[in-house]
């Protein structure tokens, strides 16, 4: 992902969303459309979400130092998690408001709603496609893209609702479409939030530990594998550490070569980017791959 191009896209999308948010708020107030106001609220939240993602993107580019020896890449994961939570809250709020609108219907000016919603749809589609390219390999950009996608869907719902209201006065369609959009966004936001949470909790990124064990034990020098940890540091960087039991008479040079061979095979077959191995002779020889407890005695 080109960092400079991503930066330009963030700036462009932010400015575009500020303009459309103002337009949709005014249009929603004058038309009385909940779908249009919900779209405006989406856009307002998007402005904050985009700024948050952009700041995290800039922070993630900082170099490693004595205080952040791993670097700052997880700033983007934190931003993705925050944006996911924000999207969940917004979805729930819009769902509740739509239900209330069924019981307390208001007059809606379909003409104003239609014009403003079409403008919103066009700008939201532009924003969505601007962020789409970088959203595939970065959870932070993905969370921003989902914001854009949710707004585009809200705009589509607003356009459809405006047409039915303007020509046939079908006002109940406005809250129905809002409910459908809020449920879709809730589903997408939940997935992003859980993915970000798994990274922050250093969960196993679907690496088969049985396969890890088989690969390392395929080397005759390795007698046992224990205290294995595999986690995703960021979207595209998987790390692993493990203890291996080897013969006592193995020399330092031979041990280094063994590390290199194991590391190469793990990277080739399981796409693990960074591997740390600790060799032992007798200690832990009978331990399992995953040792129960909090691991305070690991060293």
Feature-to-residue mapping (PLM):
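Alpha-helical transmembrane segments and adjacent TM-loop junctions that form the membrane-embedded core
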Residues: 1-12, 35-37, 41, 45, ...
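Histidine-rich, glycine-flanked metal-binding segment
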Residues: 1-31
């Amino acid at each position: 992902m080109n960092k400079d191009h991503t930066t330009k896209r963030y700036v462009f999308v932010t400015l575009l969303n500020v303009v459309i948010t103002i337009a949709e708020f005014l249009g929603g107030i004058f038309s009385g459309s909940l779908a249009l106001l919900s779209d405006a609220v989406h856009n307002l939240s998007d402005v904050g979400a985009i700024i948050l993602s952009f700041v995290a993107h800039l922070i993630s580019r900082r170099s490693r130092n004595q205080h952040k020896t791993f670097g700052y890449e997880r700033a983007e994961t934190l931003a993705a998690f925050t944006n996911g939570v924000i999207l969940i809250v917004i979805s729930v709020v819009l769902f509740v408001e739509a239900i209330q609108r069924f019981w307390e219907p208001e007059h809606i000016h379909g003409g104003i709603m239609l014009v403003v919603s079409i403008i919103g749809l066009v700008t939201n589609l532009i924003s969505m496609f601007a962020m789409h390219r970088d959203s595939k390999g970065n959870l932070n950009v993905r969370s921003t893209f989902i914001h854009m996608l949710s707004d585009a869907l809200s705009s589509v719902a607003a356009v459809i609702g405006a047409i039915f209201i303007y020509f046939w006065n079908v006002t109940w369609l406005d809250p129905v479409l809002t409910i459908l959009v809020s449920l879709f966004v809730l589903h997408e936001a939940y997935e992003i939030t859980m993915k970000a949470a798994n990274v922050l909790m250093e969960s196993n990124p679907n690496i088969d530990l049985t396969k890890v064990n088989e690969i390392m034990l395929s080397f005759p020098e390795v007698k046992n594998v224990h205290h294995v940890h595999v986690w995703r540091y960021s979207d595209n960087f998987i790390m692993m550490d493990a203890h291996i039991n080897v013969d006592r008479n193995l020399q330092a040079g031979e041990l280094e070569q063994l590390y290199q061979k194991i590391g190469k095979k793990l990277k080739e077959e399981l796409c693990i980017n960074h591997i740390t191995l600790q060799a032992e002779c007798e200690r832990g020889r009978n331990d399992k791959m995953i040792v129960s407890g909090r691991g305070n005695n690991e060293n």
